[in-house]
Amino acid sequence: MTKHLKKKRKNLLLYVATMVAGCLAIILFTYQKFQSPVIKAGQAVEKKYSAMPVPTLYIHGWHGNERSTDQLIESAENEKGAKKVLKVKVSPQGATTYLGKWNSDVKHPLIQVVFENNEAEIPDEAGWLKTITEELRQRYGISRINIVSHSMGGPVTLFWALNLRDKNSPRLQKFVPIAGPFDGVIFTDDVPNQNRIKENGEPVWKNAAYQSYYEKRDDFPRGVSVLNIYGNLEDGTNSDYLVTNASARSLRWLIKDRVEYYDEKMIKGPMAQHSKLHENKQVDRLVNDFLFD
């Protein structure tokens, strides 16, 4: 009898121990179920954030249109495996229309920006650029962008970066202005060989717009890599016909203390004419290598 009771007691203790172990396992499983996903979700979001591709926006200049950036985009597609995923058209009233489909699986997504009013003032186009960047973030979660601009698209990008960009804006990672008139335009407020760049990079003559940029220079985002491309017809004007080399190169003095990397490339000869620069294969290669290599 005693032997029988001992056996029952042993079985009871074993049963209790098994139940306790089971309860502990359930508690531990439940805890992990509700706690672990918080960490994993955070890790997944971080991975997704870091893996999100960086789209490149192409912005035309004064009197420009989609043809102004077609060759640049096609060359990126053919040479670097990039793909145009969106075209954003902006009405004269600032309303945006998105054509195409965003695809986060594309390694080098390209976005073509077209202003239907291609004679709008710089602040207006910069405001439209702000709208686009905000919508890209809200719609697709885009947190970083590159910008390639031709002509007035350069000052438009600069105005946005200095005056309209905020902490919620996508971070400007790379900027490639082509033929950017940052300190005057020939036939408007500049004359060939009137201005020059000092050894320290400062332009001798500064127009009103440039002075306003200079006052806001500390608002240019840090860490941007810049490739500034400009043309020289080699006809004695030191210009691309519309933009003097001094006007284009004056950008450096504005942002030199803010950027992570800055370089300039002069294109020479007949194909360095202002409107031909965006049809120039040398320019295509420079832009593509800078953006995608």
What are these regions (language model features)?
Residues 10-16, 22-148, 152-293:
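Lipid deacylating catalytic domains
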Residues 1-12:
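N-terminal Lys/Arg-rich, disordered targeting/topogenic segments
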Residues 3, 19-20:
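Short, low-complexity Pro/Thr/Gly
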